[in-house]
């Protein structure tokens, strides 16, 4: 298995947002993918396996699997269209967040991205302890939480 480190959102080395990318013939055990992410110590390590005409894509942080990661999706599309299937103009990814597509436009990649509805969630003791104040409301998506305490708002990303 080859592993790439790609800096998303830039055309300069050591800039942008780095992600590790592993395009594989078959899945590794979840624990192995988690250990690779821990060893990489980047915000995300992406793992992709081609299944039919699309790639199944999963993202792991050093702390666990996440449901969505934009920069690692772009990084994976870059690796696929540059090294794995250079003739491909559109890459489809099946993910925990649904189908994502990335279109290759000359030297650029254009990605669709899902929008998420905010869901109200109960205020927990963990939230109060983390913020040092009791939020008056709490809402979340699959990737983020939004907490309000009076006129102050908090955004927390997974």
What are these regions (language model features)?
Residues 1-68, 74-158:
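Active-site proximal loop and beta-alpha junction motif in alpha/beta enzyme cores
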């Amino acid at each position: 298995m080859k592993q790439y480190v790609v800096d998303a959102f830039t055309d300069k080395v050591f800039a942008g947002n780095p992600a590790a990318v592993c395009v594989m013939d078959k899945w590794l055990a979840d624990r192995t993918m988690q250990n690779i992410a821990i060893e990489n110590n980047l915000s995300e390590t992406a793992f992709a396996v081609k299944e039919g005409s699309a790639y199944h894509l999963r993202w792991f942080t050093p702390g666990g699997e996440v449901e969505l990661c934009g920069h690692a999706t772009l990084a994976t599309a870059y690796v696929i269209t540059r090294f794995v299937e250079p003739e491909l103009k559109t890459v489809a990814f099946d993910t925990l967040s649904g189908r994502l597509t990335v279109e290759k436009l000359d030297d650029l990649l254009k990605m669709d991205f899902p929008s998420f509805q905010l869901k109200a969630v109960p205020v927990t003791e963990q939230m109060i302890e983390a913020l040092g104040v009791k939020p008056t409301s709490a809402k979340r998506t699959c990737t983020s939480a939004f907490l309000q305490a009076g006129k102050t708002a908090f955004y927390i990303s997974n």
